[in-house]
Curated annotation (Swiss-Prot):
UniProt GO MF annotations: histidinol dehydrogenase activity; histidinol-phosphate transaminase activity; NAD binding; pyridoxal phosphate binding; zinc ion binding
PROSITE patterns assigned: AA_TRANSFER_CLASS_2, HISOL_DEHYDROGENASE
Assigned GO CC terms: cytosol
CDD domains, sorted: AAT_like (cd00609), Histidinol_dh (cd06572)
Job description of the protein: Catalyzes the sequential NAD-dependent oxidations of L-histidinol to L-histidinaldehyde and then to L-histidine.
Segments for region (Histidinol-phosphate aminotransferase): 441-807
Protein's name according to its UniProt entry: Putative histidine biosynthesis bifunctional protein HisCD
Source organism per UniProt: Photorhabdus laumondii subsp. laumondii (strain DSM 15139 / CIP 105565 / TT01) (Photorhabdus luminescens subsp. laumondii)
Assigned EC number: 1.1.1.23, 2.6.1.9
The family this protein is said to belong to: In the N-terminal section; belongs to the histidinol dehydrogenase family.
Lineage: Bacteria, Pseudomonadati, Pseudomonadota, Gammaproteobacteria, Enterobacterales
Cofactor stoichiometry and binding remark: Binds 1 zinc ion per subunit.
Name of the gene this protein is made from: hisCD
Amino acid sequence: MTDHFDTLIRWQECHDEQQNALLTRPAISASVEISRTVEQILHAVKEYGDHTLREFSRRFDKTVIENIRISPEEIAAAENSLNNDIKQAMQQAMNNIRVFHEAQKPIKIEVETQPGVYCQQVTRPIDSVGLYIPGGSAPLLSTVLMLGTPAQIAGCHKVVLCSPPPIANEILYAATLCGITEIFQIGGAQAIAAMAFGTESVPKVDKIFGPGNAYVTEAKRQVSQRVDGATIDMPAGPSELLIIADAGANPVFVAADLLSQAEHGPDSQVILVTPDEALAKKVITEIEKQLTRLPRNQIAAKALAHSRIIVTTSLQQCVEISNRYGPEHLIIQTRQPEQLVEKITSAGSVFLGDWSPESAGDYASGTNHVLPTYGYTSTYSSLGLADFLKRMTIQQLTPQGLLNLSQTIETLAQAEQLTAHKNALTLRVAALNIAGQGVNMNNIFDANLLARENIRKLTPYMSARRLGGKGDVWLNANEYPLAPDFQCTEQTLNRYPDCQPASVIRRYAAYAGLQPEQVLACRGADESIELLIRVFCEPGQDVVLFCPPTYGMYSVSAETFGVEQKKITALENWQLDIEAIENNLDRVKLIYICSPNNPTGNAINPDSLRKILELTANRAIVTIDEAYIEFCPENSIASWLKNYPNLVILRTLSKAFALAGLRCGFTLASVDIITLLLKVIAPYPLSTPVADIAAQALTAENIAIMQKRVVEIRENRNDLQQALNKLAIVEKVFPSETNYILVKFYDAETVFKTLWHQGIILRDQRKQPGLEGCLRITIGSRKECERVVEAISALSTVNEQPKEIAN
């Protein structure tokens, strides 16, 4: 075992004490002198404010400052002084940091832990934060971006930045990019004191972020332990790096990465762990070559004096050493790094493969470079959006909810001998029983107790509008982007409409090639889905079958009526698994098949549909949902109705007819089935205005206009597929027969959230079986499609070799 970096250490030959010593970090404990000096600085700033800040700047920074705060004119001048290259680089880095941290926005949690007991978890931004940026010969502009960007995303009301004078123009411009205007030219422990306690010029903040020297680190520690101080981001220590490398690693890259961390300071520590001794020797040689060419080679050499090259018996042993050490930065330069990272339990930030240098994370990949060091990775995490937020829980109990919990709470309070806690319950329960108020604990109304159990447990269908969002490009509901021009002609709103408006039925029958008696008009195809279950399925006896991934209302409707479901997952190509369906037809009364299928966009093989119809003859109703059939009319099987009496077809005016807001759909079936559905349908499913506009839409002239729309959408679809297929972030663009496409992304979450915040709303399909990483994109106008491509292009680089799509 040695303290020299050019000597290999064979881990297996070291006993426990030696192994512990090898992984021991350089001591960083603040000296008594530093602690005492910092304590005096804190006291002086708290007592004398700005006067002390000016005096310390003169004494420590050799600078006389008139104005502690940087003026708007100075900030503007700083921006004008920089060349475009540095400004563009900073903008690109901030964009990536923003994308990654936007994706960290927490969701509101709402649960009913038991009937009448409602609990929430919400987040709020920390009201005021202070950012400390060290001075020196090289401006740490990247740290401004790493701290300022998440503070801005979190919505912190006040963001203060302090840095020693004179503040570099790059730091001022970086602060401007992050929306920071309160910038103060003070450094060292006195800056930490000013932000912790406040002065005449510098506002007091709630939490302080940022690195610094021993005095800054000690000042942060001391103010974090004072009631009148401020909390801090995390304990600080020297920078460190551990590399796990196999025989295939490039020794030039490994050496460069080790030196990039060693040059931070003489107390930095770098460690190479590898099972390949030949690689270790090549790295030593390469370090000697590269070290001589570094301007900071003396600093790096001092850091190397307490760094290590360790040879192990296996990559698994490398992982064990890394987890034991818990590095700030971990680089895994192996042939299959993804397999090893699953075993890593403690690291600040991990860099996978030969092409992921630690400097990428330092500046521009998007992850945060403010990381726990000195072994704190066992309990601390890399800086993120959550560090600028605070969690808050909310609970609300109904009277019945309180009664349901009262005995439990009283028993636990009694066990802890906290009588006042118990009384808080006992008095409320007594109040609910006071006869003078006419309240009886047995008669308190709680709607949840009356609701059917399956409804209490039901997860509602999340329609596009129910999911919310604030956008101007809505591509999540498969609607047409422009409203058609129709005017109401009927003036009989004082009268109830016909149950089945004759003109609508007659015209749709003609359009579909059927008799009017085979057509039922309803409030969208969704109503037909429910009507069929109500007519044909006995709860607790019959079964509804469908094949996910598919339209969610089949499941929700069955669950609403308490009807059992069988879900036969589609094949990999999203065609029907006929064998599995045939083996699961017991008690099945109703089958739903979407063709073209939502959300995958593919038409179902007609041979498969015919096979299902034959298997279920006289046993079950087979419902083919043709909501998107206008985009591929050759795939319609409406003409089969004359041969298959158990066939039902669902249609809508929402898609190609561009009338989603009308809520008008149709059921096509035999006369016998239509007659049964008429028994349970609401008396007036179509309002007079709906029937009026639907009849107009079904004229020959407007059908021709609809068909032109289809041609336009198909052209836009093909162009969008081709454009997306060229982007590196896109794993696959699936073929589609509809007005939407399904796209698989390498990072779907980032794409979805980034576009969401830009006002481009897509449909997230990642929770559907087999659709991991997939988003559904409605085909909008040409301009909307171009915006989608532009937004996703910003997250991706273009492949030189486009992927092939089949369509």
